[in-house]
Amino acid sequence: MRRRKYEEFEEDNGTVLRYARHDNGGGFVESHAHVDPAAYVAENAYVDRGAVVGAGARIASAAWIDRGAVVHAGASIGTTAHVAAGAVVGRDARIGARAKIGAHAHVWDGVRVDSDDVISEGSVVRAGSQRSRAA
């Protein structure tokens, strides 16, 4: 079966979002997002409108980078993880599988967020700081 080159979704307000496949990995990138060509976006991952993904970043299968989120160079986002709207993931940070980074949260450079962890909306996670655990 031939793989589709793009997908379109219509939002409740009538806005049509068009997602094209990224050359490195085949994941879906919305036309108003910016993903560096050297970043890897796995086939079932989505990068939403206004999001930015830096060089060498890795977005795993079924991960979702929400509107306006930033994933800096060298960061890694685990399988089915969600980086919410406006959140920032620093350089070389590692977000584990199924982790959830809340809206407008900031995960600093080099920080490791464990699988299944939940970072609250607006939180700032620095290296060595306490992280919220999922219930």
PLM regions and their residue ranges:
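Extended, small-residue-rich solenoid/repeat segments and analogous flexible loops
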Residues: M1-V70
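C-terminal segments of enzyme domains that contribute to small-molecule binding surfaces
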Residues: R2-H22, V70, G78-A135
